[in-house]
Amino acid sequence: MASQDISYQYKSQQEHYPNEKISDSYVQKQNSKLTQVIQQCFSKAVKIIIQSRTVPPAAASPLLNPALHDDSASGNKINRWFNLHIQNSQDLPKDDLKLWKSNHLQSMPPMIIETYLDLRQLTSSQTIVLNDDNGNPWAVAKSGGKKQEVVLERWLIEFDHTDASGSIVDELPLIYKQAIILFRSIYGFARLMPAFKLKKRLLINKSSTKLNKLTIGNKILDGKQPISSKGRIGLSKTIIPRQMLTTDSHMSQKHFQPIQTSLGTLKISIAYRNHCDFCIHDNEEVLSTHFISMDSTPLTESGHGHTKANNTSMSVSPCSSGHPALREGSPTKRGTPPTAIQPFKVGSISNSPPPASHTPNSGYGGSLERRISITSNRSTSNASLFAMLRNPRSSTSSTHTTSNIPIAPSSSSNSTNATNMNNMSYPRSISSSHGSNMQHDDSMFSNPDSTTNTPRFSSSFGSRASRRYSNTSVRQSTPVAASTLTGGSPLSGLYIDDDISEFVRSIDSKADLRFSNSYTAHNSGEPKNNMGSPSGGDALNKFQMMKSHHQQLGDSVNASLILQHNNAVSGSGSGFGVSNSRHSSTSRKSSHSIRSPSPSMSGLYDVVPGSYGRSERRSSSGAGVPGQLSLPSGGGLAAHSPSATEPTSAATITPRETNFNFSNASFLRSASKLSATPVTSTTTAHATIHSVTGMATSPSLYQRTKVGSSIHYENVFEDDDDDEMVMKKPVVTSSGRDEEQLQHKQMKVVSIEKDAGANNFDDDDLLFTMSDMNLTKSS
């Protein structure tokens, strides 16, 4: 066979180089030497790799030990090929290299050298673990298990005869020099790999009881045969979880520079594990390490159903990846998806706690949740604090968001309760003005321990779109609805402990703390049987009393905005625009109930006195007769306009008339009292509707009129003689008119002071007196 191969090489060389005269003896000699060099490359690679894994480092290199050069000093022979002296290891049987010494280069199979960790000597109480870069131990295998070996690295040495250079130049010296560099590189790289560090550590700690059971073995395998992974942990299987690795993979590969010849190419490569820090631990030590890791790892809190932000999606625990028993005790994902605590509260309902039979620490979860709720509502009003105390399990929304909070209904609800649950997806809100028209089902948000609901109040003015919503107490008031709150329902955790219930009842016993939405439900057309509180009217009146200071500020802003809008009109329409501002403010008062005191309008003249002064200057320059204030015999007040067809509001004092008398304190006091009294029309026939101009500062300003208009009332106490006097009043010059106006105002101030002292009565007395006057006049 060798002669046939040489003749084949000779023919190929003749084809490539027809002009060359090559003797058969020279070609045969070159090919035989090249075959011997390639075979020595396989043998030298095996000796370097196995020696770096089994022989102590002091005897590994003959350069460090000159005594190894003497054959008589050692019983083993020294292999001096490629200028690298290595002892022939007795541990390496000659039969293992038989395939790569007897066969020809074309039939030489690839050689695979595996280095593995032998686990057969472990006792029943020991477990092998692998430490990662952070020092965390990860269980590999237990003693007596199915896995007996852990593959650390795999070398591949092959001669590819298909990749030939085809050169006939004297290549042996060049190939030999390249082989010297290659094996010196392999010698150095083999001592820098993780497997060599493990072998060195095992030799140093050979007397240790924890490491004397571990040994490193080597195998030489035929590369043409399939490699079985039965009974061992293969190189492709990771021990440390991928998410805990600092590198892209748990293994690495290295390809050395190949050597090309005329017969083929020699290639050497390696694949190895990046982590080889193996140790032996006792089973008790592994369990204690596992429990310590569980304590240090953030777990899911079952009390209020939220997890830490650094929890991964899968359970990753050291010393538990290789043991089913340990994996059962490791922290895993709960059956229900946890909800994370949001940095900005948006009014979400906290998740339900565990059932009563599994809540030994439910008090801790509830107290933590209450602390979160109190912290989020620290900057709110007292009313929101009352809402938090009544429902400590529900978290109210922040004042910086207007997002909706959907609440999924329970699957066990009936049709009636399902409808109520669907209505809960809307944002809950109670307007700070006279009542909101938002149609929501409040039965689901009533508190069974109290007689009223506890809302949070927003500002009394601002546009409708900028209203801030808040969640009210989410509780069931009926037994049928309460049965729907099962353990799996999102609302099942909204309950109050016994001690908290007693405290809430003591708070609810005070009538000053009770609020209701019955007035809102009445305006929105909802039936009263859906409300959870019986005393809705009284609670609404108390709510309106608390809102008086907000209403006063809203009226002031409303008047200023309307005045700015009407000041652009001509001088004749200036006074009428100011009168319209009073109509708007009085129409707002009329929406209050009779029992609640209306806010005083005395602050109206302190806010915008400059606007009134400008209105006076414009009206004085225009044509027309100023409005007159007269006191009829019945004790009421009537404002006479220049034209009988222009209706004005009863008891209206225009700012144009009062601007000249700010220094008169008695006049301001009387005007404040008159403006605080409610204005009511005597009959519906005398009421006329006019469109309202200007910007509305409260959504409840036009609740009573769906077309967005305020009601102006005609003066029913006007005397025909006074009307004729006003109509027949001669027109005078500008200077004469100013003097007449000044005299008229002085007389009017005196009459108002007298009437204010004599007619200081309640709201109910005023209505009764005006009704009597109306009956007297009509009769």
From Swiss-Prot:
Keywords: Autophagy, Cytoplasm, Protein transport, Transport
Biased segments, Low complexity type: 394-425, 456-470, 593-602, 620-632
One Gene Ontology cellular component: cytosol
Polar residues composition-biased segments: 308-320, 426-455, 471-488, 520-533, 642-652
Coarse class of the protein's main subcellular location: cytoplasm
Short name of one Pfam family: ATG13
Chain positions covered by the region annotation Disordered: 298-368, 392-488, 520-541, 571-652
GO BP of this protein: mitophagy; piecemeal microautophagy of the nucleus; protein localization to phagophore assembly site; protein transport
Superkingdom of origin organism: Eukaryota
Cellular localization per UniProt: Cytoplasm; Preautophagosomal structure
Protein's UniProt keywords contain Chloroplast: no
Function: Activates the ATG1 kinase in a nutritional condition dependent manner through the TOR pathway, leading to autophagy. Also involved in cytoplasm to vacuole transport (Cvt) and more specifically in Cvt vesicle formation. Seems to play a role in the switching machinery regulating the conversion between the Cvt pathway and autophagy. Finally, ATG13 is also required for glycogen storage during stationary phase.
Family: Belongs to the ATG13 family. Fungi subfamily.
Summary of subunit composition and partner proteins: Interacts with ATG1 to form the ATG1-ATG13 kinase complex.
Name recorded for this polypeptide: Autophagy-related protein 13
Species name: Scheffersomyces stipitis (strain ATCC 58785 / CBS 6054 / NBRC 10063 / NRRL Y-11545) (Yeast)
